[in-house]
């Protein structure tokens, strides 16, 4: 996922509900596993992201709540968009570790929020932790994820 391209597409589409839906669909096509839960991007700016996840049967577990892995997927996507949107075009990131705390059964429309303070100069690989919080419609925090990103320069393309 090229951060510059993601932000350029968002700047064209993020201003309307239809555009945000189209952006979210395009993101799902580009990142199929993350797209499998059907989350929608509602806010995106360098270093910050907000997603919503409608409560649908396909993301439920046997307890009629949203499955733990769907919550991890949502947290990772929010942290990734927040992190990558703040990186320079010469950098890239990949998840190396995820921790998730589940605080309440997740039911109803969920909102995931993440803020990342991207490292300044990226001239070597480094570890960077980004937190993503997930809230239910009542505003109660249902889960929080801590996602460890390895951030580094993109390899130079040999001609």
Put a short name on every predicted segment:
Residues 40, 99-101, 113-115, 133, ...:
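Residues located in well-ordered beta-strands
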Residues 81-117:
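Hydrophobic beta-strand-centered segment that forms part of the acyl-chain substrate-binding groove
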Residues 1-50:
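Non-catalytic linker/capping segments at the edges of enzyme domains
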Residues 37, 47-49, 94-98, 108-110, ...:
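A generic structural signal for short beta-strands and their flanking turns/coil linkers
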Residues 52-54, 113:
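Beta-strand residues in well-ordered beta-sheet regions across diverse protein folds
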Residues 1-16, 106-107, 117-159:
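HotDog/MaoC-like acyl-thioester-processing domains
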């Amino acid at each position: 996922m090229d951060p510059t391209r993601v932000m350029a597409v968002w700047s064209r589409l993020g201003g309307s509900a239809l555009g945000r839906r189209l952006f979210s669909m395009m993101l799902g096509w580009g990142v199929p596993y993350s797209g499998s839960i059907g989350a929608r991007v509602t806010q995106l700016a360098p270093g910050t992201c907000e997603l919503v996840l409608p409560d649908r049967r396909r993301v439920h577990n046997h307890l009629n709540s949203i499955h733990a892995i769907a919550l991890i997927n949502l947290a990772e996507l929010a942290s990734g968009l927040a992190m990558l949107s703040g990186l320079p075009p010469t950098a890239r990131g990949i998840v190396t570790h995820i921790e998730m705390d589940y605080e309440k059964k997740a039911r109803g429309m969920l909102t995931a929020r993440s803020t990342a303070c991207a490292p300044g100069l990226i001239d070597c690989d480094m570890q960077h932790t980004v937190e993503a919080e997930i809230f239910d419609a009542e505003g109660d925090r249902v889960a929080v994820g801590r996602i460890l990103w390895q951030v580094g320069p993109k390899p130079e393309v040999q001609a």
